[in-house]
Structures are given as structure tokens and as C-alpha cells.
Amino acid sequence: IEAFWKWWPSLRNDLHTLRITGGEPLMNPGAMQFFDLLEDEPAPHLEITLNSNLGVTFDRVDRLIARVKSLIEQKKIRKFSFFTSIDSWGEQAEYMRTGLKCDHWERNMKEVIKAGATVNLMCTYNVLCVTNFQKLLHKVIEWRKEYGKEAVSFDTPYLKEPPHWMINILPEEFIKHQEDTLKFIEDNMDWFTGVEYEKFKRVTDYMKENPVSDLKILQGRRDFYSFFSENDRRLGTNLLEVFPEYSNFYNLCKNIYENYDNRNK
């Protein structure tokens, strides 16, 4: 941090984009200190992007937004955009990201949009997204209807490691869920962009082609049961209560795990 403050005077006039990430920047006093500095030392050509999980208190978000809104209105910065992670909606999303509360997250996200910032959703598309991702897409449409199509964007990179989170370990019958979600985007192109469609189609094609080796799929299925059974035990959660449609797959993974365990005793 000290090195940055010393560097900033020479950096300020030539820097066009600054991304503040973490950790959680809104828990770091240095982030607000930087926005305070911009009040006295404007950078009207500067675009600032900030990463946050939006799980912090309302007060922290409100203080940031008030400062950012002031900087934009006074043209002391050029633009502010926001990146945050979410992979579905409701109890499924909360299961995937321990500690996430969708109502809390949504309230904070809306305050960011109201300040004039673009919110970019980073969706890490994983094994648990396939049957319920449409829930998030419905919310995206809702937010775009309320705040404008440009207010919220989303990206869908698929997760490749660790194997127990890969979509490729799912049986073929899950492809129907993936195709249904792609069709939902196609049927609602008034609210989605061509880029969003193509990126999700890429995920769908990757799931269908499944270039992953049989050995890695076997490893992923074994680890799926190992990880989520232990995760549920430690956190007091229950995967099959939240994702009942995964019951047959879960039992398949359990059998693989138990057979592997028995062979190695």
C-alpha cells in the first residue's frame, strides 16, 4: 500500500484503467482511502473497476457508492464499473457459495447500479449450475427491465479444475437441462446479447463434446461424493435437499467412491 501511495503521483496522469481486487476490497481501509484521495487529486480520464462479493454490510457499500457518485458527477473520474461473482439464484446459489445471502447481495448490487455503475456478473459455470442457471437468467431479465439492458452484464466461463466441479462429470441426461437453458436465452434475445448467447453456446458445445478423459471423469465423480458429503457434514447442509434432481448422480458417485475406497483398504 505504501509503495502505491508513493507511485500514484507519477502514475495518475497516464493511467487509464485501475482494477481494485482482493480479498474483499470493501473490507480494506485502503480502498476508501484511495477514493478519498481522488476528491483532492482528480483523474478525469480514469476508469475504475472494483471486485467485491457484495457480502459486506450495507453501510460499507453505501459509503463507497456515495463517494463514487460524487466523483462521477464532478467528473473527477471517467467511469466506475463493478465485478461480482454469482453462479445461480436462491438456495442453489447460496449452497454453491458458502456465506452468500441472495437478498443481501441483491440489495447491495442494486445500490451499485443506482449510482450509475455497470455491474458485471462473473458466473463460474460448474457442475451444480446446469439444472438451475435459468433462475439467474430470469433475475438478469428482471434487473435489465428495471435499470436498462446495459446496467448488468454476465459472463459464463466454465470451470475446469478441480474435477469434482466440472460439468463434464455429469451423465448425458443432464445435457437436456443445458440445451433448455440455451433455448431460453435464444427465445429471449430482446434481453440478452449475441455475445452472451454465443458464450453460453460454447459452454453447451463443450459439455456435449466432453473432451475430458474417462479417467478424469471417474476421478471427478469419486471426488464429487467425497467433497460434498464431507462439506454437508461440516456445514450442516444437505446437497440433495437443495438439488434433488442430482440424486441418481450422487448415488453413482457414492458407489464409485466406495468401490475405490474398498479396493484401497
Regions found by a protein language model. Give the residues of each.
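Core AdoMet radical
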Residues: 1, 12-29, 41-65, 71-106, ...
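Conserved RecA-like ASCE ATPase "motif II neighborhood" in helicase/translocase motors
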Residues: 1-7
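A short acidic, amphipathic alpha-helical/loop segment
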Residues: 7, 30-37, 63-67, 111, ...
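A structural motif corresponding to the C-terminal end of an alpha-helix
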Residues: 7-14, 41, 71-78, 108-119, ...
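Helix N-terminus capping/helix-initiation residues
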Residues: 101, 171-172, 236
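Flexible glycine/acidic-rich beta-alpha junction loops that bind and position SAM and/or redox cofactors
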Residues: 125-131, 148-182, 197-202
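Catalytic cores of alpha/beta
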Residues: 127-143
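Radical SAM enzyme core and accessory elements
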Residues: 186-265
